[in-house]
Curated annotation (Swiss-Prot):
It holds the Pfam family Hexapep_2. Homotrimer. Pathway: Amino-acid biosynthesis; L-lysine biosynthesis via DAP pathway; LL-2,6-diaminopimelate from (S)-tetrahydrodipicolinate (succinylase route): step 1/3. It catalyses: (S)-2,3,4,5-tetrahydrodipicolinate + succinyl-CoA + H2O = (S)-2-succinylamino-6-oxoheptanedioate + CoA. Keywords: Acyltransferase, Amino-acid biosynthesis, Cytoplasm, Diaminopimelate biosynthesis, Lysine biosynthesis, Repeat, Transferase. The keyword Repressor does not apply. Its main location: cytoplasm. It comes from Variovorax paradoxus (strain S110). This is 2,3,4,5-tetrahydropyridine-2,6-dicarboxylate N-succinyltransferase. GO terms for biological process: diaminopimelate biosynthetic process; lysine biosynthetic process via diaminopimelate. It is found in: Cytoplasm.
Length: 277
């Protein structure tokens, strides 16, 4: 079934210029709808984890998400008292009280999750936004004004602090999703974008910005890397010294790995079980 779906989606992607809400084969519509539905219930994911820091990205699923926008027109929608004009309905608006209880998710107004995202049991959505294709793991807190971008992968027992931005893949188009692995703490107003991977058990301090071109400097080893924070790292924002060709000194922004996570760090960033009953 999955292989057949992939073949239909890949073929439709190559012919996407000729696909619209009024012109698309039924098998393409059905295939795209099936993918969105499976993303919505967590049976499909844009990326799957093989080991720490190692992920397989399923490009055909991302293509299906993009094709879904071509297959629908904007329409007026209602989710409770929230009115909007869009192509994608919200995730929870049609659920009954019992269905919401069974989901195990707590949703604080005016949090919004789009259909096609998955929110696992025990997760908490404070007033925040989760885009289509995203995956939010068990016990994760998406705090106030945090945003989880399209197709982003957020692990279990993660804390996304207030105002955190996790980048999406749809615009600008990215090769792979931004990934925050299990048991990470992302400090307030931090931004992780452009398919960067934050490996498990890491802590980002407040106001850390990491994209693919951001130098990630390890204070202990002196090494500089890009696009990935190693497991168990504690990262703060900082600067690295540079020189112009004429010898003039200046500095550029960098993310600095200052140490590995220890008991003191954990005591300051541990999740509160009282909020998850």
């Amino acid at each position: 079934m999955t292989q057949q779906l992939q073949q239909i989606i890949d073929a439709a992607w190559e012919d996407r210029a000729n696909i619209s809400s009024s012109a698309a084969p039924a098998e393409v519509r059905d295939a795209v709808e099936h993918v969105i539905s499976e993303l919505n219930n967590g049976k499909l994911r844009v990326a799957t984890r093989e080991s720490v820091g190692q992920w397989t990205v399923h490009q055909w699923i991302k293509k299906a998400v993009l094709l879904s926008f071509r297959l629908k027109d904007n329409e007026q929608m209602q989710a409770g008292s929230l009115g909007f004009y869009d192509k994608v309905p919200t995730k929870f608006s049609h659920l009954s009280a019992n269905e919401l209880k069974e989901s195990g998710v707590r949703i604080v107004p005016p949090a919004v999750a789009r259909r096609g995202s998955y929110i696992a049991k025990g997760a908490i959505l404070m007033p925040s936004y989760v885009n289509i294709g995203a995956y939010v793991g068990e016990g994760t807190m998406v705090d106030t004004w945090a945003t989880v971008g399209s197709c982003a992968q957020i692990g279990a027992n993660v804390h996304l602090s207030g105002g955190v931005g996790i980048g999406g893949v749809l615009e600008p188009l990215q090769a792979g999703p931004t990934i925050i692995e299990d048991n990470c703490f992302i400090g307030a107003r931090s931004e992780v974008v452009e398919g960067v991977v934050i490996e498990e058990n890491s802590v980002l301090g407040m106001g850390v910005y990491i994209g693919q071109s951001t130098p990630i400097f390890n204070r202990d080893t002196g090494e500089t890397s890009f696009g990935r924070v190693p497991s168990g790292s504690v990262v703060i924002s900082g600067n690295l010294p540079k020189k112009t060709k004429s010898g003039q000194e200046y500095s550029t922004y960098a993310a600095i790995i200052v140490k590995t996570v220890d008991a003191q760090t954990r005591s300051k960033t541990s999740l509160n079980d009282l909020l998850r009953d």
